[in-house]
Curated annotation (Swiss-Prot):
Taxonomic path: Bacteria, Bacillati, Bacillota, Bacilli, Bacillales
Name used for this protein in its record: Large ribosomal subunit protein bL19
Natural source organism: Geobacillus kaustophilus (strain HTA426)
Gene3D superfamilies: 2.30.30.790
Coiled-coil intervals: none
Superkingdom, taxonomy of origin: Bacteria
């Protein structure tokens, strides 16, 4: 009984405005940052390294920031209200669910083939 109640409560809190994305996809994440009494939006762009969990506790590791610092990678909850917008820039064609090997690669070696068969 209690398990069903928890599922119903968390189902209401899931975000439906997020696009479908997978590890290997290049995404642009718009994050709300609060500094004092001001709120601004900071944009991160990079490759998703992994997704973990399900439902309200689903995490995404990445994106590995291409814009600011090559070695920066972040993880956050997918359904958090701190994510203002999430855009899929490019679909990647990979054979793994966890792309940890991308952490050591730089430049052209870190490229991922584009999946042209993916539904847009």
């Amino acid at each position: 009984m209690m398990h069903h109640l928890i599922q119903e409560i968390t189902k209401e809190q899931l975000r439906t405005d997020l696009p479908d994305f997978r590890p290997g996809d290049t995404v642009r994440v718009h994050v709300k940052v609060v500094e004092g009494n001001r709120e601004r939006i900071q944009v991160f762009e990079g490759v998703v390294i992994k997704r973990r969990g399900a439902g309200i506790s689903e995490n995404v590791h990445g994106p590995q920031s291409v814009l600011w610092r090559p070695a920066l990678s972040a993880h956050s909850r997918v359904h958090t209200p701190k994510i203002a917008k999430l855009e899929v820039i490019r679909r990647g064609k990979v054979r793994r669910a966890k792309l940890y090997y991308l952490r050591e690669l730089r430049g052209k070696a870190a490229r991922i083939k584009e999946n042209t068969n993916a539904a847009q």
